[in-house]
């Protein structure tokens, strides 16, 4: 029974994410032209907004089941008002139409048919595996354990006995959501969905550079790798990180060809979300920053205010998006990247 409730809760949360994300995209004028992008961006923006809401509850009001249920109820009502114009009906129509087009495509190639069957079977198996109790060491030691400590203390705290207490836990806020409501399988259902979304974001990236068929092959081979299959039934944050990285690169490439600032700022937002998800996001932040400098190199030689402003604004947006977790670390330990900055910040507990 708990598994069924977890699934229903996941569906409701997905609706909330899409509704909130759609509103954010509309507010900033970031709605893309392709429907697939709209749905993916809406979910990821809504997902991130909920993660930050849960974070700020933990540093202010405190974690109680009544507060979380009240917030979710309010967000669900708000989402239905946002989506009342038929957005969900359009989503269903889009899925049906995509399936029809998918059937037409796969009948033209035995290879596409084989890959299509493979990804469907694997996704179903991953979905079933997501309902098993968590056994992964990292999930049990901090992806689920640290949010459980937050729940026990009813706020975001710091304990110095384990290095992972200092890492950004943006994605783990959804783990906390499931745990505090009493549905331990919920985080794994959401992470299963993140596996599919990360494959779709790779498709969006690859199809923009090459072709739709190339994007399909890239997404399928990515999703069928053993690592992604393993991650799809855990509570880890890697799949969320991959989604942010793929979209950050995608919008950077779009900006390089069209020079539309909104696509560059979208790239910056997803870079910031990558930084808020794991310390490994720094690897991506440095890489995409170097990529931006290379793309802008000809303009940088002119040293105009505009060419200098672009990298600075990009970095500022990324920093602001990721900053809550690093500010939290600085307040609690004196080291924003605890424990790795101890030699610079002379931080505590190390």
Residue map of PLM features:
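Transmembrane-helix signature of polytopic, membrane-embedded enzymes
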Residues: 32-41, 185-186, 200-226, 257, ...
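Membrane-embedded, hydrophobic transmembrane alpha-helices
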Residues: 1-103
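Perimembrane helix-loop-helix junctions
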Residues: 101, 284-318, 326
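Membrane-interface transmembrane helices that cradle and orient dolichyl/undecaprenyl
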Residues: 248-264, 298
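Transmembrane-embedded, aromatic-rich helix segments that form part
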Residues: 218, 265-269, 280-295
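Transmembrane-helix motifs of polytopic, lipid-linked glycan transferases
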Residues: 22, 48-51, 76-83, 186-209, ...
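Short acidic/glycine- and proline-prone juxtamembrane loop motifs at membrane-interface regions
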Residues: 230-240
């Amino acid at each position: 029974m708990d598994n069924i409730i977890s699934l229903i809760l996941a569906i409701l949360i997905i609706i909330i994410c899409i509704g909130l994300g759609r509103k954010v995209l509309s507010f900033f004028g970031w709605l893309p032209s392709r429907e697939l992008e709209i749905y993916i961006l809406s979910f990821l923006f809504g997902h991130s907004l909920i993660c930050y809401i849960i974070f700020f509850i933990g540093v202010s009001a405190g974690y109680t089941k009544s507060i979380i249920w009240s917030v979710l109820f309010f967000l669900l009502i708000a989402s239905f008002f946002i989506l009342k114009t038929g957005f969900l009906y359009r989503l269903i129509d889009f899925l049906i139409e995509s399936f029809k087009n998918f059937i037409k495509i796969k009948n033209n190639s035995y290879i596409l048919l084989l890959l299509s069957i493979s990804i469907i079977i694997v996704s179903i198996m991953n979905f079933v595996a997501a309902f098993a109790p968590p056994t992964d060491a990292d999930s049990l030691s901090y992806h689920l354990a640290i949010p459980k400590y937050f729940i026990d203390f009813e706020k975001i705290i710091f304990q110095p006995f384990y290095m992972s207490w200092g890492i950004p836990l943006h994605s783990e806020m959804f783990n906390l959501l499931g745990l505090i409501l009493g549905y331990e399988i919920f985080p794994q259902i959401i992470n299963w969905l993140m596996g599919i979304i990360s494959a779709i974001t790779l498709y969006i990236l690859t199809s923009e550079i090459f072709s739709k068929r190339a994007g399909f092959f890239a997404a399928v081979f990515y999703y069928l790798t053993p690592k992604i299959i393993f991650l799809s039934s855990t509570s880890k944050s890697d799949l969320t990180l991959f989604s942010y990285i793929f979209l950050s690169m995608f919008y950077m490439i779009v900006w390089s060809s069209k020079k539309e600032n909104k696509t560059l700022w979208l790239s910056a937002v997803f870079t910031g979300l990558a930084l808020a998800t794991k310390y490994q996001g720094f690897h991506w932040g440095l890489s995409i920053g170097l990529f931006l400098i290379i793309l802008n190199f000809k303009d940088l030689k002119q040293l105009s205010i505009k060419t200098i402003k672009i990298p600075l604004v990009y970095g500022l947006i990324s920093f602001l998006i990721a900053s809550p977790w690093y500010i939290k670390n600085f307040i609690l330990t004196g080291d924003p990247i605890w424990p790795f900055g101890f030699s610079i910040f002379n931080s505590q507990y190390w």
